[in-house]
From Swiss-Prot:
GO terms for biological process: symbiont entry into host cell; virion attachment to host cell. This is Envelope glycoprotein B. Its main location: virion. Disulfide bonds join 69-527, 86-483, 158-223, 315-362, 552-589. Residues 422-443, 802-829 are annotated as: Disordered. It is a single-pass type I membrane protein. The keyword Cell membrane does not apply. Residues 1-22 form the signal peptide. InterPro entries: Glycoprot_B_PH1, Glycoprot_B_PH2, Glycoprot_B_PH2_sf, Glycoprotein_B_ecto_C, Herpes_Glycoprot_B.
């Protein structure tokens, strides 16, 4: 991120510089008043400086190229860590040895898989007058049985037919509507080298029938074999192919009786093939060595891969770093491992991990070869002290520790063991002798030798213990001094950055950078390198102008060009070949002044603010303040990047989870496939129904086409009506109108219901609304109600009258139905004609009214 931000800063600075200085090109007189001598940094020095920067060698600041720097607030932000905690190793036991560090392998397990399937394409072709057309096309794929995959993997051949059972009926699809035969597989060109495909039919069979205006169904069967890579990550519960297929099982599943690997696929779809052979296409027909292969039938395709075992094929740990000068310190219940080559320490529990080599056989060769190479480097001074030890850190690292002992200590211990052995031998021999032999002359010599051996033993033991304690003390002091020195250096850099942040950061980076303190942090940005051949210093350092005769530049003015720019720009030469962007660094002119300015490989001498001569930089003596310490130089310390965010946090930070998306997509695709299979078993598959109906209509010829067109027209009409209603409802105004009508209907129903309730409660008031007025004015109008007997007579008369009218109405309806016929239709037609002429039918009257006319 730092390099990216600095690059962006450099481009922004370059753009700002072009906008600022494009309007101030130098005049011709200023161009002529430049120093003609060579004054630029040579290409060889620039190239050497860049190579040194790439190798981590800090170059002389005077060899930096001419450049324009600007401390921008948008640069990379840094701060110095001023608080460190050094380990307290006092009175601790220190051991030196070889440290091997293994990190957890996050690279997925990659293996080869093969995908087999047969793709069936059924097309309905219309033979038109002017052109043919594909009116319908259905594509589906099916898996391939193992007996046929053997032919595909060995001789690259397959059968061009497919048998499918639908609703208890066997359907046979044959390529080009021909007969079943063996066809060859041919390679297919692809974009990726990791995916290779072979197929048998590259073209779709779409030839129309011989009947003009007729429909014909064509079938294409294509055998396809895809060889690609699959990836799996721990805990190996699924793997994904490069073409997007997901298998919910471990790639190390083997169907063993004590199987521990996960398998989420149905057992009926899994097959283990023994002595299976896969041949490369170039060597088809040969007989390679057989192997065990796993097959899974996904209904739409078959997938296979070679059986592998986890502890052999996949290694959980990957070698990261090795150190032959590490220190192990015991701190109570934990162990601290420190190496001078990296700025980090590792701590683990003081218990070893026993099951590492048993579960991960792949580590044996790596550990053995790495230990052998590291021991060869320290073989002259150290020797192994015991066997290798294995520890696991809390961060998930595996540490392999091989204790070492110095050769001097080993020689001293060998001498001590030899003396002890000789002393024990002498003691044993003395006890077996008789008392008479103990009084012999030689017994005095043996006693003296035994005493001398005891003294020698104590001296050797003291020397051994003292040397061991001193070595431990030296290792302890080195460990603490190294930590304190790093802390002091960090504090020193922090304080120096307050004085000149650009020099400090350039020294740390080893290349020219621009730095500026913005509060408590430092903003660092790249410098823009100008065209080295265009940099020229002016002869005079006096400020031009009549009113500025007493002013002179404190730094010599310089003209330069940017790379890929033809305009000349003016500035002032700064320190270490830096070009200042302004010409405001002026001072009052003094008499008899001398100035020396370094630019590139030359030193420019100015007398009275006028250039006098140019001399090489080497002619000026240097003040050597470097004190050489005649010791072996400390090895370089490379700062390692500390992982701020864990792998899980990085995975969760993205908005797209590609693995989950693919798994869910394939999962629901398989669910739809299962649903389609169920529908096929129930003989209600829509595609099969449409295909069967289309075949029936084709067999009927013209009649079938007429029926098909009529059915299509009716279906289209109803579809248009339904679609129109749905679209009308979807429209905002239509939806509001519909809701308004529904509300009106609901209100009408409520009002009618209330009216019916009122009629049932008080029918007389509903029929005669003036009954209340009559009741209130009964005394004034002197109206007396009839008796209940008279009321019953009136109600009975009304009932009888209504009962007598019902048979007559039924007879009129029956007579009307009997008279309805051709004559009735004729009378109706005549009535229509009469109405057009202006005639109207007469109104009927009751019989008693007609008879009453005189």
């Amino acid at each position: 991120m730092a390099h990216t931000g600095s690059t962006v800063c450099a481009f922004l600075i370059f753009a700002v510089l072009k906008n600022v200085f494009c309007q101030t090109p130098t005049s011709s007189s200023e161009v002529e008043d430049v120093i003609p001598e060579a004054n630029t940094v040579s290409d060889n020095i620039i190239r050497q400086q860049r190579n040194n920067t790439a190798k981590g060698i800090h170059s002389d600041p005077s060899a930096f190229p001419f450049r324009v720097c600007s401390a921008s607030n948008i640069g990379d932000i840094f701060r110095f860590q001023t608080s460190h905690s050094c380990p307290n190793t006092k009175d601790k036991e220190h051991n030196e040895g070889i440290l091997l560090i293994f990190k957890e392998n996050i690279v997925p397990y990659v293996f080869k898989v093969r995908k087999y399937r047969k793709i069936v394409t059924t097309s309905t072709i219309y033979n038109g007058i002017y052109a043919d057309a594909v009116t319908n096309q259905h594509v589906f794929s099916k898996s391939v049985p193992i007996y046929e995959t053997r032919r595909m993997d060995t001789i690259y051949q397959c059968y061009n037919s497919l048998d499918v059972t639908v609703g208890g009926n066997l359907l046979v699809y044959t390529d080009n509507d021909g007969s079943n035969m063996t066809v060859d597989l041919q390679p297919v060109d692809g974009l990726s080298n990791s995916v290779r495909r072979y197929h048998s039919q590259p073209e779709i069979h779409a030839e129309p029938g011989w009947l003009l205006g007729g429909y014909r169904r064509r079938t294409t069967v294509n055998c396809e074999v895809t060889e690609t890579d699959a990836r799996a990550v721990p805990p190996f519960r699924y793997f994904i192919t490069n073409i997007g297929d997901t298998i919910e099982m471990s790639p190390f599943w083997s169907k063993a009786w004590n199987e521990t690997e996960f398998s989420g696929e149905p057992d009926r779809t899994l097959t283990v093939a023994k002595d299976y052979r896969v041949v490369d296409y170039k060597f088809r027909g040969t007989q390679p060595q057989g192997h065990t292969r796993i097959f899974v039938d996904k209904e739409e395709y078959t997938l296979s891969w070679a059986q592998q075992f986890r502890n052999i094929s996949y290694c959980r740990w990957a070698h990261w770093k090795s150190f032959d000068n590490a220190i192990k310190t015991e701190h109570g219940k934990s162990l601290h491992f420190v190496a001078n080559d990296i700025t980090a320490s590792f701590y683990t529990p003081n218990t070893q991990t026993r099951e590492v080599l048993g579960k991960h056989v792949c580590l044996n060769n790596t550990i053995e070869s790495e230990l052998k190479s590291r021991l060869a480097k320290v073989n002259d001074t150290h020797s192994p002290n015991g066997t290798a030890q294995y520890y696991l850190t809390n961060g998930g690292l595996l540490l392999v520790w091989q204790p070492l002992v110095q050769q001097k200590l080993l020689d001293a211990k060998g001498l001590l063991d030899a003396v002890k052995k000789q002393q024990n031998t002498t003691t044993t021999t003395t006890t077996t002798r008789s008392r008479r032999q103990r009084r012999s002359v030689s017994s005095g010599i043996d006693d003296v030798y035994t005493a001398e051996s005891t003294i020698l033993l104590t001296q050797i033991q003291f020397a051994y213990d003292t040397l061991r304690a001193q070595i431990n003390n030296v290792l302890e002091e080195l460990s603490r001094a190294w930590c304190r020195e790093q802390h002091r250096a960090s504090l020193m850099w922090n304080e120096l950055s307050k004085i000149n942040p650009t020099s400090v950061m350039s020294s740390i980076y080893g290349r020219p950078v621009s730095a500026k303190r913005i509060g408590d942090v430092i903003s660092v940005s790249h410098c823009v390198v100008v065209d080295q051949d265009s940099v020229s210093l002016h002869r005079s350092m006096r400020v031009p102008g009549r009113d500025k005769t007493h002013e002179c530049y404190s730094r010599p003015p310089v003209t330069f060009k940017f790379i890929n720019d033809s305009h000349l720009y003016k500035g002032q030469l700064g320190v270490n070949n830096e070009i200042l962007l302004t010409t405001t660094a002026v001072e009052i002119c003094h008499e008899n002044t001398e100035h020396y300015f370094q630019g590139g490989n030359n030193m420019y001498f100015y007398k009275n603010y006028r250039h006098v001569k140019t001399m090489p930089v080497g002619d000026v003596a240097t003040l050597d303040t470097f004190m050489v310490l005649n010791l072996t130089l400390v090895e370089n310390i490379d700062f390692q990047v500390i992982e701020l965010y864990s792998r899980e946090e990085k995975r969760m930070s993205t908005a797209f989870d590609i693995e989950t998306m693919f798994r869910e997509y394939n999962y629901y695709t398989q669910r739809v496939t299962g649903l389609r299979r169920d529908l096929t078993d129930l003989a209600t598959n829509r595609n099969q129904f449409v295909d069967a109906f289309g075949s029936l209509m084709d067999d009927l010829g013209v009649v079938g086409k007429t029926v098909l067109n009529a059915v299509s027209s009716v279906a289209t009409l109803f579809s248009s009506i339904v679609s129109g209603i749905i679209n009308f409802i979807k429209n905002p105004f239509g939806g509001m109108l519909l809701f308004g009508l529904i509300a009106a209907v609901v209100i009408t129903v409520i009002l009618l219901n209330r009216k019916a309730k009122r009629f049932a409660q008080n029918p007389v008031q509903m029929i005669y609304p003036d009954i209340k007025t009559i009741t209130s004015q009964r005394e004034e109008l002197q109206v007396d109600p009839i008796s209940k007997h008279e009321l019953d007579r009136i109600m009975l008369a009304m009932h009888d009258y209504h009962a007598s009218k019902q048979p007559e109405s039924k007879q009129d309806e029956e007579q009307g139905s009997t008279t309805s016929g051709p004559a009735d239709w004729l009378n109706k037609a005549k009535n229509v004609l009469r109405r057009r002429a202006g005639y109207k039918p007469l109104k009927r009257t009751d019989s008693f009214e007609s008879t009453g006319v005189p």
